[in-house]
Amino acid sequence: MRHAFVFVISTVLASSAARAQAPRKTPGGERARVEREIQKLEEHRFQAMIGVDLKTLDRLLADDLSYTHSSGKVDTKATFLAALRSGELKYESIRTEDIKTRVYGNSAVVTGRGEIKVKSGNQELSFPIRFTDVYVKRDGRWVMVAWQSTRIAQQ
């Protein structure tokens, strides 16, 4: 009898410890809601980039943003917004597809493909990209902390 009691207690403690160490998962319905919320933020961000809506971008981008362009140039939030404000960088259109959003508690990773038309300095460019960006929830709201895009080779 004593061995059975020790076995039951050991099993309960082991399963409790395993549950405590398991990563927190967002319930299915909540995860889907957050994924939709992040996708809407992405749409607003792209529209704000095209429309040079600096107020919206200031709200959507984290102060510690790392924005890596497909050229390899890295901007901070301040330098990215300054380039848009000055007209040095002007997005003409941004079309996206194959968007996937994955939520991990207070973080979300977005991946996808895009077609970018942009004026950078005196150059007008149009090219396809693959991108990854990361959102985190801070002070009750989602902000983008990282963007990285890679040009897709034209075939």
Q: What do these predicted ranges mean?
A:
Residues M1-A4:
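Positively charged n-region of N-terminal signal peptides that target proteins for export
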